Amino acid sequence: MGKRLISQNRGRGTPKYRSPTHKRKGAVKYRSYDEMEKDGKILGTVVDILHDPGRSAPVAKVRFANDEERLVLIPEGIQVGEEIECGISAEIKPGNVLPLGEIPEGIPVYNIETIPGDGGKLVRSGGCYAHVVSHDVGKTIVKLPSGFSKVLNPACRATVGVVAGGGRKEKPFVKAGKKHHSLSAKAIAWPKVRGVAMNAVDHPYGGGRHQHLGKPSSVSRHTSPGRKVGHIASRRTGRK
């Protein structure tokens, strides 16, 4: 009898494939969208900068004027002790949070809300930023890092600047163990062994005197879970 495939183990939800969110510092999102932000602004002070396991960017603990504390994504150039502003009348400065409708065209932004008050959903990885392209009646167009232009509500908030931690890809891992530990913080199993490199008991493509599939790579959508590898329910395969 063969062994379970990686996809079967992942679906079972074993600890190896569960994201260790209990190690995170907490929810990283904007404060509630209250009248203080809608009518003016509120000041906050960066009291600490923290490393959040599994996140590619550092987070800052910010204490606001009403003694509320939040974890926020910080831009490049922010340090402990600096003040940030949140609200419709905030200054256009890195780290400040404003509605998209109040941010001029061409300004880099990140941690963009898709619905006003959702806390920020888009452009949150280290070194990423989007651009405000244009404003129109009831909508703002933002160009995302992928090149896709998204139409958003002008009341959606965003942070001015570029997410910190942009140089992380310039330093190589050097050792395989370091990469393993880095990806395990996100529940990504690494290294990934090819099916043809396995034994026959471990994978449908395993075994043989040399590495080859030995069978068609197309399988039915209704085939058994232990055989569902390759091109699943493919209409066609190969180059056009």
Curated annotation (Swiss-Prot):
PROSITE patterns, sorted: RIBOSOMAL_L2
Gene3D superfamilies noted in UniProt: 2.30.30.30, Nucleic acid-binding proteins (2.40.50.140), Ribosomal protein L2, domain 3 (4.10.950.10)
Keyword Ribonucleoprotein: yes
Keyword RNA-binding tagged: yes
GO CC field: cytosolic large ribosomal subunit
Alphabetically ordered keywords of this record: Ribonucleoprotein, Ribosomal protein, RNA-binding, rRNA-binding
Region annotation (Disordered) ranges: 1-28, 206-240
Record's compositionally biased regions (Basic residues): 13-28, 224-240
One Gene Ontology term from the biological process aspect of the record: cytoplasmic translation
InterPro entries: NA-bd_OB-fold, Rib_uL2_dom2, Ribosomal_uL2, Ribosomal_uL2_arc_euk, Ribosomal_uL2_C, Ribosomal_uL2_CS, Ribosomal_uL2_dom3, Ribosomal_uL2_RNA-bd_dom
GO molecular function: rRNA binding; structural constituent of ribosome
Compositionally biased intervals (Polar residues): 1-11
HAMAP family: Ribosomal_uL2_A
Subunit description: Part of the 50S ribosomal subunit. Forms a bridge to the 30S subunit in the 70S ribosome.
Functional note: One of the primary rRNA binding proteins. Required for association of the 30S and 50S subunits to form the 70S ribosome, for tRNA binding and peptide bond formation. It has been suggested to have peptidyltransferase activity; this is somewhat controversial. Makes several contacts with the 16S rRNA in the 70S ribosome.
Similarity annotation: Belongs to the universal ribosomal protein uL2 family.
Protein name per Swiss-Prot or TrEMBL: Large ribosomal subunit protein uL2
Species the sequence originates in: Methanococcus maripaludis (strain C7 / ATCC BAA-1331)
